[in-house]
């Protein structure tokens, strides 16, 4: 996959001054961003997150999901550590796009869960692809991650690309009455590790 580095700049945030790296996936035209902090190319495991774009949660404060809260918590954790990386991937709505996500929300308003809604629209439950992460991490010199995620598919995707996941760091945040069914469905149907019994597990490739 031809993913090319375009430019980098400083990005001051309330948490830290990150370096923002821009990448272009020439095959899809999608623009992806990495926020980095500190020395991440020293060979040691780097605290990191793969975060798929969620306009409603990240920018519009939606409580239908936990995405915005996870994004903020991940950046705060990296800032506390003084070293880390966050890949912001343009895969809105688990890969189905913004307008289709709104269509899925409409079905959820009628009683469907998040997986059923995607499937009724003709999509897989999760259409995301993480192949673009490899060239971005290689460009930054990152070989091993302490991955902030509840999603075992992200761990497997990285290990399948020979990116070592030294540790899975649970990211449980943003729970509220509006996303209770959504989070339960992610655990029951998508295998997300939402409970304490899963903490510290690293699935083997």
From Swiss-Prot:
The active site is at 126 (proton acceptor), 128 (nucleophile). It catalyses: GTP + 4 H2O = 2,5-diamino-6-hydroxy-4-(5-phosphoribosylamino)-pyrimidine + formate + 2 phosphate + 3 H(+). Its cofactor is Zn(2+). Pathway: Cofactor biosynthesis; riboflavin biosynthesis; 5-amino-6-(D-ribitylamino)uracil from GTP: step 1/4. Keywords: GTP-binding, Hydrolase, Metal-binding, Nucleotide-binding, Riboflavin biosynthesis, Zinc. GTP binds at residues 49-53, 70, 92-94, 114, 149, 154. Binds 1 zinc ion per subunit. GO terms for molecular function: GTP binding; GTP cyclohydrolase II activity; zinc ion binding. It is an enzyme of class 3 (hydrolase). GO terms for cellular component: cytosol. InterPro entries: GTP_cyclohydro_II, RibA, RibA-like_sf. GO terms for biological process: riboflavin biosynthetic process. Its EC number is 3.5.4.25. CDD domains: GTP_cyclohydro2 (cd00641). It holds the Pfam family GTP_cyclohydro2. The keyword 4Fe-4S does not apply. Catalyzes the conversion of GTP to 2,5-diamino-6-ribosylamino-4(3H)-pyrimidinone 5'-phosphate (DARP), formate and pyrophosphate. Belongs to the GTP cyclohydrolase II family. This is GTP cyclohydrolase-2.
